[in-house]
């Protein structure tokens, strides 16, 4: 189970630590080039969900589970038509209290937030690359904004191949073998 430790401010000498347990990872975003996850805390309502930097978390299994679902959702969005019919939605069996309605609206809004190429922005450059659940992902910087998103490399290869090539060219290095260096020295000594 995921955990996050928080020291209480009122403890002077004993430094008591309070541990929060992550129940579920709900969403992912990039803020100033750092990955943050929206977390549902065990024993707390959805109004207490918080965005936390990846480096502060100790729940790799939950993050991995979320990324698998996130990846499937992304691939599904690319293959399915955008519009959904109202007739296919199920009604909830729970009561529609004010809290239920608010939390449902929050979930719908967070799911409606466009990410990556869905935002319709023009890619400027690739800042970095990472492996996420076995898939290569690029951190894409967009033109006319300071924001960046993780996008599937497969998608970037199709939508902006020249930017992908530029990213690889910037990082391309040539390594000479020792025999090559010796041969060049011999040739220059003969001249």
From Swiss-Prot:
Give residue numbers for the modification (N6-acetyllysine).
40
SMART domains associated with the record? CHROMO, ChSh
Where in the cell?
Nucleus; Chromosome; Chromosome, Centromere
Please indicate which superkingdom the organism of origin belongs to. Eukaryota
CDD domains, A to Z: CD_HP1alpha_Cbx5, CSD_HP1alpha_Cbx5
Q: Name one GO biological process term.
A: negative regulation of DNA-templated transcription
Q: Which UniProt keywords apply?
A: Acetylation, Centromere, Chromosome, Isopeptide bond, Nucleus, Phosphoprotein, Repeat, Ubl conjugation
Q: Which InterPro entries match?
A: Chromo-like_dom_sf, Chromo/chromo_shadow_dom, Chromo_dom_subgr, Chromo_domain, Chromo_shadow_dom, Chromodomain_CS, Heterochromatin_chromo-domain
Which residue ranges does the record annotate as region Disordered? 1-21, 70-117
Predominant location: nucleus
GO MF term set: chromatin binding; DNA-binding transcription factor binding; histone deacetylase binding; histone H3K9me2/3 reader activity; histone reader activity; identical protein binding; methylated histone binding; protein-containing complex binding
- Which residues are recorded as modified (Phosphoserine)? 11-14, 92-93, 95, 97
| Name recorded for this polypeptide | Chromobox protein homolog 5
